[in-house]
Amino acid sequence: MLFALGLLREEDRPGLIAELRATQGADGGWRVWYSGPPDLSTTVEAYYALRRLGVAADDPDLVSARAMVHRLGGADRTRFFTKLWLAVLGQYPWRHLPVLPPEMILLPDRAPLSPYRFGSWARGTFVALMIVLSRQPVYPQDVGMQELFTEAAGTNPAGEPKTPGRWTPLLTRAMGLAKLYTRRPFGPLRRLAEARVARWICERQEADGSWGGIQPPWIYSIFALHALGWPLDHPVLKRALDGFDDTFTVRDGDRLRIQACLSPIWDTCLAGVALADAGADEDDQDLRASAGWMLSK
């Protein structure tokens, strides 16, 4: 996001590099969780972030990361969200990504593809992506990453099922029709839908600038509104961007990172369950104190 919107502060560059280097495994890959296996998509994202931060391609850490990417199948086999980011940064063809026509916001609440058929945590991402996937913004970068692709970028389209199911032909045809409509939408209906999506997003922004207190809908909402032509100094976008600095940015010594979410109630609950499962007494003062704190919230 910082690269795309031109918001990277020069003083933050060393901290971001230090964080990425510190979390790289000895085998060159990055993990989704501690002690887990190297993850292809995470490794591709970290590699390109370091390249974009100014680390040379022949840096030993990037040489080992590149080798891991190729061992895991190459950037052409990354997940949908990684390819989405690469498309936004001009590193992957938008035509190989699925679309979500913003007109879906106009569906009745009980319709199968209505946003209200999704959980609240997914709904914000789903709605914001209606704009991002239809507007297909590109923020060209002066650093490429073609060395991570084992085939031409786009030969393994995002969203392609590993094992086709009985609904695959129907869904593939539906996506083809959606893409065809997205290329030539009905103007008045598209404008109505985009305005409805923008209003939906703005009405659900939290006081701290986030959407749902989690990173995905937050970032995609920023990109959605910006793709609609909203300037970064618009009050909604300014509040959203300021929120990253205020509550989500963590400085740990010489390292800098942005948290995926803030979840003290959730974390307290999970920690209490873990302690109980480990044999802690139900009358334990700490457990009772945490339960009381959760009830107070």
Question: Which residue stretches match the model-derived regions?
Answer:
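Preference for long, amphipathic alpha-helical scaffolds in soluble/luminal domains
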Residues: M1-K297
